[in-house]
Amino acid sequence: TINKLSDAIEKDQAMVSKILKLVNSAFFGLRGKISNISHAVVVLGFNTIRNAVVSISIIDAFSVKESLDGFDIAEFWKHSVAVAVTSKYLAEKTGIHSADDCFVAGLLHDMGKIVLLQHFKDLFQKIWRTVKGNNLSFYEAEKSQIQIDHARIGGYLTRKWQLPPALVDAIRFHHCVTPDANDQNLLMIIHTADIIVNTYTKKPKNDLVLSGIHPDALNVLGSRFDTISDWYPDVLLEIESACKFFLEGSMK
């Protein structure tokens, strides 16, 4: 319930401060100032505040301080936030899934990389050397080196956290779309947002050609691809705002 969520958050004053800072930031763009958690839950909704708590907690818990052989943890989280915001936008504009859930799934989609970095460092180094030496994506390098990939590891981790099966599958299958996923729409959004973000950060903005998107995603989100150069610059501004909030404290 709203009261239980508010009471739980209010036991952690650091979290209270972060949530209030977030809801009053440009990321949400609210007109009036929100001064307490109960008001925030009423205005933005139970799921939005719950997912904000999840997002803040995970970034705080998994913000490894060191970088490794050119793997920049700050850039990792910037990419994750960018996919989260892009996923949220696609959900809002298409209406095919909860924008809040898409944000969280987008934020967590690459969590398996952090698990590898923190707990299997030698293996991570081997994969990363393959990425840099052969100009491969992380996923391609994993497939050439080991029998498992970061998406499956992320799926396993989020299942252990008892997150909803649809979210778990969106993380697990975002590189390898399958009809067996619990929620096809959520999976298609995360899969697509990841490709958009990766493409937009590597290609000239006036020569954006998306490749590797699953045909089912093209069917579900087709009209959005035709106008990406019109709407993605606005999403970039929202990404910048989200990164400023979620990362500026955690990366220090």
Predicted features by range, described:
Residues P215-K252:
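Terminal helices and disordered tails flanking the catalytic cores of nucleotide-processing hydrolases
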Residues T1-K132, L136-S211, M251:
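Conserved alpha-helical "signature site"
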